[in-house]
Curated annotation (Swiss-Prot):
Pfam families: Histone, Histone_H2A_C. Keywords: Acetylation, Chromosome, DNA-binding, Methylation, Nucleosome core, Nucleus, Phosphoprotein. The modification Phosphoserine is found at S2. The N-terminal serine is acetylated. That serine is also phosphorylated in approximately 60% of the molecules isolated from erythrocytes. Transmembrane segments: none annotated. Residues 1-18 have a biased composition (Basic residues). Belongs to the histone H2A family. Residues 1-23 are annotated as: Disordered. GO terms for cellular component: nucleosome; nucleus. The keyword Nucleus applies. This is Histone H2A. It comes from the Eukaryota. The nucleosome is a histone octamer containing two molecules each of H2A, H2B, H3 and H4 assembled in one H3-H4 heterotetramer and two H2A-H2B heterodimers. The octamer wraps approximately 147 bp of DNA.
Length: 124
């Protein structure tokens, strides 16, 4: 008698829910935080997986754009300024994070068209 029930397979190496879903973000930790945070009385099994996937996608999107901004400025390290430029130059991310202030982010370079010097016509 092996104590594995009726014809069950031996339990192999445990696999995390993150790796099962093919994610880098921790599904188990997000599930724990959802339960502890009193957001709802009960939390479904799929909710933390979906939330982890959404958070991972948003992080990847912001980091991709910030990496491009860093490369444009000939830098190898992403700083808050690069995050600010990435978010504010992307229409959808700017709308999503409109109420967010990024410390040490600075502002977007912007000069009103009225203030620019007028172009004069050169006659031949």
């Amino acid at each position: 008698m092996s104590g594995r029930g009726k014809g069950g397979k031996a339990k192999g190496k445990s696999k995390s829910r993150s790796s099962r879903a093919g994610l880098q973000f921790p599904v188990g930790r997000i599930h724990r935080l959802l339960r502890k945070g009193n957001y709802a009385e009960r939390i479904g099994a799929g909710a933390p997986v979906y939330l982890a996937a959404v958070m991972e996608y948003l992080a990847a999107e912001v980091l991709e754009l910030a990496g491009n901004a860093a490369r444009d400025n000939k830098k190898t390290r992403i700083i808050p300024r690069h995050l600010q430029l990435a978010i504010r130059n992307d229409e959808e991310l700017n709308k999503l994070l409109s109420g967010v202030t990024i410390a040490q982010g600075g502002v977007l370079p912007n000069i009103q068209a009225v203030l620019l010097p007028k172009k004069t016509q050169k006659s031949k």
